[in-house]
Amino acid sequence: MNSPDIALIKTYLLTLQDNICAALAQADGHAEFTEECWVREEGGGGRSRVLVNGAVFEQAGVNFSHVSGAMLPASATAHRPELAGRSFQALGVSLVIHPLNPYLPTSHANVRFFIAEKPGEDAVWWFGGGFDLTPYYGFEEDAIHWHQVAHSLCQPFGEQIYPRYKKWCDDYFYIKHRQEARGIGGLFFDDLNSPDFMTCFNFTQAVGDGFLAAYMPIVARRKALGWGDRERQFQLYRRGRYVEFNLVWDRGTLFGLQTGGRTESILMSLPPLVRWEYNYQPEADSAEAALYRDFLPVKDWLAIKGETH
């Protein structure tokens, strides 16, 4: 089967949104998700869910969208000029979780499908997605676990998949104007349409389903750790990097805004509180300095597992 089944993809994505929201709400134990269904004037719509002011999660947004249009925006055709003049559909689930506790990392995941069509020509389609982790205070155990889950879900699809998509993630979530990584990476893939539709769909499902397996054990391990104002101030400062990346470099944000997407849903990825400080430098040998020294530089976390276990 190589003709895309959009109904199948949509059913999976809606179920994925349900499952992730249920797991996050259960882990929080205090706040619930509120849901807003919206319609896009140019075609399509979505289902946005957000949890705010929880006991564990300061803000967690989990979006489903299925938008369509008669013509692609500049952000989509810049690196694919052959798509100009085609109608399109884009489906996806995208989420960003900003915990309250600074010892809990921010996490992001996204799985999406895109198809561009023109009468008399073959449809052009692909899958994309991934997940990545942004700690404020790093724990080697968590980083290894995150990458172990990523590696394991990739294995059935080939030995080369994890290293390829890990590198793509490291390269993509790099804040060029800061010359530093946004976090410790994970997986990132795009333009996936080979060898056939079902293989690509199965891999995309593995990534989507892998997110909870990667993130929830970290939540369970760290959510009860005590923290104070020092940790909170550092978390708010580092959240600034998240804002900078999303507004300056992220293709998904630009695509959403250029296609007339729902601004509130697109910018739900931004943290509710953030701060900047001119020329901040962490204290030498501090826990804050360790983030820059031990976690943000790109490394092979699974090789570390082999050395320490």
UniProtKB/Swiss-Prot annotation:
Listed GO biological process terms: protoporphyrinogen IX biosynthetic process
Checking Pfam families in the record gives:
Coprogen_oxidas
Q: Which PROSITE patterns match?
A: COPROGEN_OXIDASE (PS01021)
Write down the required cofactor(s): a divalent metal cation
Q: Where is this region: Important for dimerization?
A: 242-277
Q: What is its main location?
A: cytoplasm
List the subcellular locations: Cytoplasm
Alphabetized GO MF terms: coproporphyrinogen oxidase activity; metal ion binding; protein homodimerization activity
Tell me the pathway. Answer: Porphyrin-containing compound metabolism; protoporphyrin-IX biosynthesis; protoporphyrinogen-IX from coproporphyrinogen-III (O2 route): step 1/1
Q: Which residues bind a divalent metal cation?
A: 98, 108, 147, 177
Q: What does this protein do?
A: Involved in the heme biosynthesis. Catalyzes the aerobic oxidative decarboxylation of propionate groups of rings A and B of coproporphyrinogen-III to yield the vinyl groups in protoporphyrinogen-IX.
In the record, the note on similarity to other proteins reads: Belongs to the aerobic coproporphyrinogen-III oxidase family.
Q: How does it assemble?
A: Homodimer.
Q: What is this protein called?
A: Oxygen-dependent coproporphyrinogen-III oxidase
